[in-house]
């Protein structure tokens, strides 16, 4: 991947592995109290997870599925419960450790955890790839390249999310450009579907959009 991709990936790793680990762990713990704003994000992510999983068969027995950017492992658990052999990948070692600790004992034989880049060819072939909010910080050309490369190793579909190009999210993006802070989250980049299609092709389609308070995300599907 080009240097822009690597630079953003390293920034994402630094943020989630050093600055935001505890906050992310709380956000992804259902009975943990969070602020009203973060509660809307939690609810939005729960809804989006259900949308994404609806694109995969209920029975994934015999399927090899990558949870790309698995975080604390919520999607990983659901995929394993459907019978998939899950490759759970995240750039953050600390989040991987949390995901390992939270994995139910009866599912441990169904999941292998990996710290690193979801685009690493060494991860092998997959039937499906799920990438929830893992590509939201990257530019359209980089997303196109990731999809193209992953598509060569994916038999059925890549289901992923982006930040849609809305007035609300564009305002946040401009604020992030104007007032950068070294200790804050990397700035997500809103995308229009037609621009992404110019880099990934017409096999990229929109599935659904979830908007819940401060969480706004769009589910897309790429079929190689």
UniProtKB/Swiss-Prot annotation:
GO terms for biological process: bacteriochlorophyll biosynthetic process; light-independent bacteriochlorophyll biosynthetic process; methylation; photosynthesis. Pathway: Porphyrin-containing compound metabolism; bacteriochlorophyll biosynthesis (light-independent). It catalyses: Mg-protoporphyrin IX + S-adenosyl-L-methionine = Mg-protoporphyrin IX 13-monomethyl ester + S-adenosyl-L-homocysteine. CDD domains: AdoMet_MTases (cd02440). Keywords: Bacteriochlorophyll biosynthesis, Chlorophyll biosynthesis, Methyltransferase, Photosynthesis, S-adenosyl-L-methionine, Transferase. Its EC number is 2.1.1.11. GO terms for molecular function: magnesium protoporphyrin IX methyltransferase activity. InterPro entries: Mg_prot_MeTrfase (IPR010251), Mg_prot_MeTrfase_C (IPR010940), SAM-dependent_MTases_sf (IPR029063), Small_mtfrase_dom (IPR007848). Pfam families: Mg-por_mtran_C, MTS. Converts Mg-protoporphyrin IX to Mg-protoporphyrin IX methylester using S-adenosyl-L-methionine as a cofactor. Belongs to the class I-like SAM-binding methyltransferase superfamily. Magnesium protoporphyrin O-methyltransferase family. This is Magnesium-protoporphyrin O-methyltransferase. The gene is bchM.
């Amino acid at each position: 991947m080009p240097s822009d991709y690597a630079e953003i990936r390293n920034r994402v790793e630094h943020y989630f592995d050093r600055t935001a680990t505890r906050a992310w762990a709380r956000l992804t713990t259902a009975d943990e109290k969070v602020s009203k704003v973060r509660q809307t994000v939690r609810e939005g992510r729960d809804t989006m997870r259900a949308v994404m999983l609806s694109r995969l068969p209920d029975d994934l027995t015999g399927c090899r599925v990558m949870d790309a950017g698995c975080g604390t492992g919520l999607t990983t658990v659901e995929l394993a419960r459907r019978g998939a052999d899950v490759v759970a990948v995240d750039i953050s070692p600390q989040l991987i450790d949390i995901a390992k600790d939270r994995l139910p004992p009866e599912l441990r034989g169904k999941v292998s955890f990996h710290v690193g880049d979801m685009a690493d060819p060494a991860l092998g072939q997959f039937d499906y790839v799920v990438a929830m909010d893992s590509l939201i910080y990257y530019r359209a050309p980089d997303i196109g390249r990731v999809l193209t490369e992953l598509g060569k190793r994916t038999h059925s579909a890549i289901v992923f999310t982006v930040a849609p190009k809305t007035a609300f999210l564009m305002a946040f993006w401009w604020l992030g450009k104007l007032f950068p802070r070294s200790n804050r989250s990397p700035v997500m980049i809103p995308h229009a579907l037609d621009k992404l299609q110019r880099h990934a092709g017409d096999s990229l389609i929109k599935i659904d959009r979830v908007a819940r308070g401060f969480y706004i995300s769009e589910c897309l599907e790429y079929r190689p």
